[in-house]
Amino acid sequence: MIISAASDYRAAAQRILPPFLFHYMDGGAYSEYTLHRNVEDLSEVALRQRILKNMSDLSLETTLFNEKLSMPVALGPVGLCGMYARRGEVQAAKAADAHGIPFTLSTVSVCPIEEVAPAIKRPMWFQLYVLRDRGFMRNALERAKAAGCSTLVFTVDMPTPGARYRDAHSGMSGPNAAMRRYLQAVTHPQWAWDVGLNGRPHDLGNISAYLGKPTGLEDYIGWLGNNFDPSISWKDLEWIRDFWDGPMVIKGILDPEDARDAVRFGADGIVVSNHGGRQLDGVLSSARALPAIADAVKGDIAILADSGIRNGLDVVRMIALGADTVLLGRAFLYALATAGQAGVANLLNLIEKEMKVAMTLTGAKSISEITQDSLVQGLGKELPAALAPMAKGNAA
């Protein structure tokens, strides 16, 4: 199969993976309206083509939290990467490290902090959920600090799990889920051999280390379901801000007032995100939410964005809408499931090439030159409601 875009990796991953795993990463909440709009709204953002600008000295490099990035992209936190490729978190981290961008380890990773951090030269980022078990949160933070993690990404848009109908249909949850997953695994031999057998242990490493016993998929679902905390408020985050002495990023912002609260709280960054359309269906796409948030806090706090980003053109669009850096989620997971570290490395190369083309043809020699002026007036900043119908194609 010829791979020329992230969509090719998605098609390949669907063939390789058991359905319960493919649909777990590919699906969203409820009817998946927001999930589809993430991609469609971003694709409708029109860039201004400019010509004869002498683009010979183009550079994608940028700086974030005193870290030099080869391009304004990081691999965002994605749970269960180690179920998509053998020791998947390590493979993805190595690809990011080689490309000169950050890798973010999820709380619910298969590979624990202590396995991933030593595998790369660059300090990784660590993502943490708001959980009832504050002992686990403190333990995870202590381990992340000890491993040299540079930035904490604190996810706040999950006080309760979203309702994901695809999971019940695919076997990730629902009646006879364990048996359905087993039958799917044995009929997908490439995955069964590479990950199912040779990718063990399939513990949730960060949770197992705390609980002192193995935690499989059923344990993961049960433990997390019992530990999400709907009572959380900004005040509950104060001890984390005091404990963590590195940059702290609040992930899950869609409203300008919440962005202002993050500035008042003292966060170093925010992620404009709807959790890839996996939490509340019907909320704004990140592309629609981003311009108003940038108007409210640009310059006061670092603005990251995710959800719907599939290629280098999308990266340029998000930056023009107001982001400083973007996070990749599904895009790199498709590549990881298809070809491991090599797949992620190739995806990052594709994104870099696509960014260079977009910047060359819009007259932006550097990341700082990608601004609202790079957008066609009326299509980028405002994103009117009639701009994009609900998507019928790929997930966000």
Swiss-Prot record:
Free-text function comment from the UniProt entry: Catalyzes the conversion of L-lactate to pyruvate. Is coupled to the respiratory chain.
UniProt protein name? L-lactate dehydrogenase
What gene is behind this protein?
A: lldD
Q: List the GO biological process terms.
A: aerobic respiration; lactate metabolic process
Keyword Secreted in record: no
Q: Residues in the active site?
A: 275
Record-listed E.C. numbers: 1.1.-.-
| Principal location | membrane
Which cofactors are named for this entry? FMN
Q: Which organism is it from?
A: Escherichia coli O127:H6 (strain E2348/69 / EPEC)
List positions binding substrate.
24, 129, 164, 278
